[in-house]
Amino acid sequence: MKILFQADQSLSYGINEMSKYLAFEIAAGEYTVKARQIDGHDLSVCVKGKEINIIYAEKCHFFRALGLAIQNINEGKEDFEISEKPAFRSNGPMFDVSQGGAAFNLKTMKKILCQLSLMGLNMAMIYCEDSYEVQNRPYFGYMRPRYSEADMKELDDYAYELGVEMIPCIQTLAHLPDPLRWKVFADVKDYTECLLVGEPKTYEFIRDMLISASRPFRTKKIHIGMDEAGSLGRGKYMDMFGYKPTTQIMHDHLEKVMEIINELGLEPMMWDDMFFRCYGTHGYHQPDNPVPEEVKAAVPKGMKCVYWDYYHFDRSHYEGVIPRHKELSDEVIFAGGIWTWVGFSLAWSKTLKTTEVALDVCKKMGISDIIATVWGDNGTECLANTTLIGCQLFAELGYHDNIDMDEFAARFKFCTGGELADFENLELLDKNPLTEPLKDPSNYNASKYLMWQDILTGLCDYNIDGYALNDHYEGLAEKFKAAIGRNGQFDNMFEFSYHVANVLAIKSEMGLRLTRAYKAGDKEALLDIAKVQLPDLKARMEKLRLVHMKNWFELYKPLGWDIMDMRYGSLFARIDSAIMEILAYLDGSLERIEELEQERLPYHGEEGPIKYLNYFGHIVSASRIAPKA
């Protein structure tokens, strides 16, 4: 398709980038685009004959409108008009590039920014605990995937041309376990992952962080974190200053951080859960408790509060909770979630249901700014480009009161190349015979613990006994295999998902089969497991590792892959050990296989499916391998 543009020069770079992505030629020929910017105007597209008229308020509205025009033309429509009104002032994703060690490389991030603009999303955050360089602090992000100042400036420049505001998102209190492991930060460390409040060196450090995080970006906005500091003041702080109420410690810290922020001319926002947790308002997500005056007074002037909630399906919940948060700040930002952080799977049903309800209530209650969080807890096994379907959801709900799923599927296909029906199957990695009867199966991440649990000492074997898991994953592998070749940029992701399911098709019940054969004295079955099944499993796992590695190096910075190599490597070693023990038992050199003689107990003493088992160290062994691994 050839398109001639009569538009403001400020759109030229973005148009050129979109031409590469959407494969149109910028030249006189088939269509002419005439664009006008009118502040505060709804997005509108009018196509008559070969003329495309676009009215827009922001750059990203123009690119969404351009995409809508091309999409409808490709679908065979000739003369049509489209008008959309953005429901939110800002709307876009926050990608966690720290907790799981998966930091997008610049090529990937630029491609994502292009797609966000095409969707009509005008904001993006990169959540960095220590994934950015801090001046004069070489151990901050040392040997971790981090962005240089030049990297972040390059991304900000690119995003700006596409109408996407990039906002730095950091931590200035807790959630800093990786940098605080180094002794060079001992003077500013309260406990494992929290900064030492009241120590002057802490605020020198925070100043350096704020300067380094904000300097590459045009915006003055900055997210300063400060969530989930559950043990605040109970480590070195207590040794130095004695006991003080958490409320006082938070107040003192915020006051000092705000002095730095005001001096630097920044516009802060923060997660607001600590206001509720510190002041004893009986939980963060409880709608029925009044907000004490002292809580309201604790919020500094100029601080925007971010209410995060990705869990609830009930409209009444959000209707009850949002007013409590609005009592803290004149401008509350809502942060929902794209559920990819519990293992190998995208929990699409939960993402869809929670987002539809939450954003509808946000519209009705006057929430202007929306964040779609994409966390990376404990390994980021789920490939992060999978989250684009969630970004599409937040985008469409940002322009429409509700969505028609057929129209959504077509829109997602146009913007990304992905097939909705295939993406809907991704959650079947966790939604299996164990969890299908449950009301909310997304709380159960079977794919993760079935993949990483040990063969000889399976801590989860008791809870999975009696379910046809191998058959489930064998069928799912075929579904993923069929998806390869029709999902464009996601074909590699479906190849990865195929290999995950292909491994689980024999590994899920391997420990159970091995234990039964041993206890039954079935030496023929044991020999088959040692000579055929376990070597087959190892071969399948090696293929999975190589495909995973290919995807990782295509999407992310290389640093961070070491975590996954260590996980796969431990499985390979344990498979080898299992084979050696079985063969030694069969030839009589090993009197018994002691691991298989242990009684299998329900995990945590609880019957039924295991809920949200996400720490690798809690899956692979009953012994400590590393803190919080």
Regions found by a protein language model. Name each.
Residues 2-28, 34, 75, 79, ...:
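Substrate-binding groove of N-acetylhexosamine-processing glycoside hydrolases
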Residues 2-4, 8-10, 50-263, 269, ...:
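Feature activates predominantly on carbohydrate-active enzymes
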Residues 29-31, 38-41:
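Interfaces and regulatory segments of ATP-dependent nucleotide/adenylate/phosphodiester-chemistry enzymes
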Residues 36-39, 57-59:
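Short, flexible beta-strand-to-coil junctions
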Residues 45-46, 179, 234-235, 281, ...:
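Short, well-ordered secondary-structure micro-motifs
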Residues 40-48:
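Catalytic zinc-binding patch centered on the HExxH motif and its immediate surroundings
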